[in-house]
Amino acid sequence: MKQNNQNVKDKKISKVAFSHVGCEKNLVDTEHMQGLLDKEGYEVGNDIEDANVVVVNTCSFIETAREESIRKIIEFTDQGKEVIVAGCMAQHFKEELLKEMPEIKGLVGTGDYQKIAKVIKRVEKGEIVNEVSKIPEFIADEKIPRFVDKNKFVAYLRIAEGCDYKCAFCIIPKLRGPQRSRDIESIVSEAKNLAAQGIQEIILISQITTNYGQDIYGKPSLARLLKELSKVSVPWIRIHYAYPTGLTDEVIKSFKDSNNIVPYFDLPLQHSHPDVLKSMNRPWQASLNESILSQIREQIPSAVLRTSLIVGFPGENQKHFQHLLDFLHRHEFDHVGVFIFSPEEGTSAFDLPNRVPSEVADARKDNIISIQQNISKKKNQLYVGTTIKVLVEKISENKELIGRSYNFAPEIDGNVILSIKNYEDEKNYIGKFVEANICFADEYDLYGEVIKTL
């Protein structure tokens, strides 16, 4: 990044690097902190070795994420870096962290990342800083500086922050606060800015995207938002974290009628059995799962369906698990993520009886993965012999183009790997769309040949 503030050019300032753990919501926070520091004249990047201040933006959703965050904190403090801990762990353990890890120089909560420059200035003066609000309330809009890596051609656009649901297994409402939506004008403005920077795909995110607008408009307003975003000149707009309750006829119609909103439905259903869903404090969902999935497939035959599931939830027995397997066979999702229940202190599920033994939960996870691999392979093989549109994101050492069609989301799904007969300079492909013929498919990826650039 370049320094924007010429007034600080001659000052001795910190070189700040970022280490990021966790979800894309955390990534957006990191990008805003980078943008804010850049505006203040700091040298900002990802080169830990060259930096004297390292901001570790942490995740605290499950134990493994906390362990990874702690490892990074220890690694960087051992290197003599001034470490500032931001994000969900700072919010979760705002009192304990500074006591148990006195080598940490500062904390920045999930609703306080806009204060990062002030925090670093105080750390530079030798202060130990705890900048963590009790209840996160802030959400950045398009006016808050943000560094977006244009080399990736994909950007996440946060439409709301926080969550008002109280799912039994989830700590996020305590870490991210209540839902607070941005207004439609703000979101559209940022989308236009991203499109002007050459972003080819915008992914809408929040804790529950289908609840967007409930807090500011008095009712869920995703359909209104999508109607306005469909006018933005960006090839692909993708929606993550859509819950069944918010997939109204109007929302589904927005997918169907738009040219740039891809028919990709990310539905974190977690389970299928009514008893388990009730224990998860999602009793409303069981009656909707079947009807919503059928409705999507009927109205949008080209729809791609992804879900995430939890196995080993307290009280889940073989009957419940078999119900889930039957559900998967019946609906044949294109993509499935499966996780083993992680008991998190501070959630209502933490004290639930009838814990599932770890070896049983592991076996159930493996069972689902095996079943889904067969389904995904069958689904992918339907593309063999067809022509598809692919966004090229990188080039392999073998001069193969690697990208995605609309049915693959970045990071979590597969890739499309393409050979090309007359290879030219990579700048002719990266960040551009090509038309490709698919020749082969496995359970994860598609393989084919480039027909032409688009």
UniProtKB/Swiss-Prot annotation:
The gene is rimO. [4Fe-4S] cluster 1 binds at C23, C59, C88. InterPro entries: Elp3/MiaA/NifB-like_rSAM, Methylthiotransferase, Methylthiotransferase_CS, Methylthiotransferase_N, Methylthiotransferase_N_sf, NA-bd_OB-fold, Ribosomal_uS12_MeSTrfase_RimO, rSAM. It comes from Prochlorococcus marinus subsp. pastoris (strain CCMP1986 / NIES-2087 / MED4). One of its GO terms (cellular component) is cytosol. It catalyses: L-aspartate(89)-[ribosomal protein uS12]-hydrogen + (sulfur carrier)-SH + AH2 + 2 S-adenosyl-L-methionine = 3-methylsulfanyl-L-aspartate(89)-[ribosomal protein uS12]-hydrogen + (sulfur carrier)-H + 5'-deoxyadenosine + L-methionine + A + S-adenosyl-L-homocysteine + 2 H(+). The keyword 4Fe-4S applies. One of its GO terms (molecular function) is aspartic acid methylthiotransferase activity. Residues 14-125 form the MTTase N-terminal domain. It is an enzyme of class 2 (transferase). It holds the Pfam family UPF0004. GO terms for biological process: tRNA modification. The keyword GTP-binding does not apply. Its EC number is 2.8.4.4. CDD domains: Radical_SAM. Keywords: 4Fe-4S, Cytoplasm, Iron, Iron-sulfur, Metal-binding, S-adenosyl-L-methionine, Transferase. Its cofactor is [4Fe-4S] cluster. This is Ribosomal protein uS12 methylthiotransferase RimO. Its main location: cytoplasm. HAMAP family: MTTase_RimO. PANTHER family: RIBOSOMAL PROTEIN S12 METHYLTHIOTRANSFERASE RIMO, RIBOSOMAL PROTEIN US12 METHYLTHIOTRANSFERASE RIMO. NCBIfam families: 30S ribosomal protein S12 methylthiotransferase RimO (TIGR01125), MiaB/RimO family radical SAM methylthiotransferase (TIGR00089).
